[in-house]
Design a protein with these regions (language model features):
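Extended ligand-binding regions for polar small-molecule ligands
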Residues: 40-45, 49, 63, 109-110, ...
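Extracellular/periplasmic bilobed ligand-binding domains
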Residues: 86-122, 137
């Protein structure tokens, strides 16, 4: 909110308090996540239903993760010992060193941090998901035009995947017979005028960074962290990614 950056795009969960209390606006969701738990294989635990009183849990202090963890254990009537740190690397190091029985954060984070463990194969992520964690870009309140530009930049990437427009074929799609595709690549209509942009602003996004699927593959799937997109698949393919049409 200090004005040092124009956009924040990281693992920040969209919540009511963050949206309403601190002068920020979430423009959309670019990753649907959920909180889970990691344990050591030799613990014999394969489900959160096996958690017992006295369990210790590592997490980040001052986060929705910490609040979700508290709510989860309280709702199950399980007494637990929180082991909280400010930095993610500190949490991972503490868990890896055996200072806690389980490590909890968003499941994407668990998958990524598991690769940093001394022996990654000694750890498993439990199947249960205990929260909804919609993650997405954030801008400061008070600049409606910039907010719209960021929102529709995200929408462009998702819609481009839906219509098969990629960084490789975007220019060729200008001659498509589909009016929606033509609008998406700036060959028809005046989609940029409302933002003070030219008509190929969304075409440049697609050519430079690709559609949503290309971005997911490059940054997540190809790393081996989460090859299965799960809810982050298009709505036409069993996921929940769905954006308003560009028209």
């Amino acid at each position: 909110t200090s004005g040092e950056i124009d956009i924040l795009s990281r693992n920040t969960t969209w919540t009511l308090s963050r949206d309403a209390d601190i002068g920020l606006t979430f423009v959309g969701v670019n990753f649907y996540d959920g909180q889970g738990f990691m344990v050591r294989k030799d613990s014999g635990i394969t489900s959160t239903s096996q958690f017992k009183n006295g369990i210790s849990a590592c997490t980040n202090i001052g986060t929705t993760t910490e609040l979700n963890m508290r709510d989860f254990f309280n709702s199950k009537g399980i007494s637990y010992t929180p082991v909280a740190f400010e930095k993610a690397d500190e949490v991972v190091a503490a868990y890896d060193a055996g200072r806690c029985d389980t490590y909890t954060t968003d499941k994407s984070g668990l998958a990524a941090q598991r690769t940093k463990m001394t022996n990654p194969d000694d750890h498993i992520v439990l199947p249960e998901t205990i929260s909804k964690e919609p993650l997405g870009p954030v801008v400061r309140q008070g600049d409606a035009v910039w907010e719209d530009i960021v929102r529709w930049s995200l929408n462009t990437m998702i819609e481009a995947e839906e219509y098969g427009v990629t960084s490789a074929n975007a220019d060729m799609m200008k001659t498509s017979e589909n009016p929606q595709i033509k609008r998406l690549v700036g060959a028809e209509g005046e989609m940029g005028a409302a933002f003070g942009l030219d008509n190929e602003w969304n075409l440049r996004i697609i050519k430079q960074v690709g559609n949503y699927g290309e971005s997911y593959k490059r940054n997540i799937a190809d790393t081996g962290i989460l090859p299965d997109r799960g809810p982050n698949e298009l709505w036409t393919k069993g996921g929940i990614l769905y954006v308003p049409p560009s028209r």
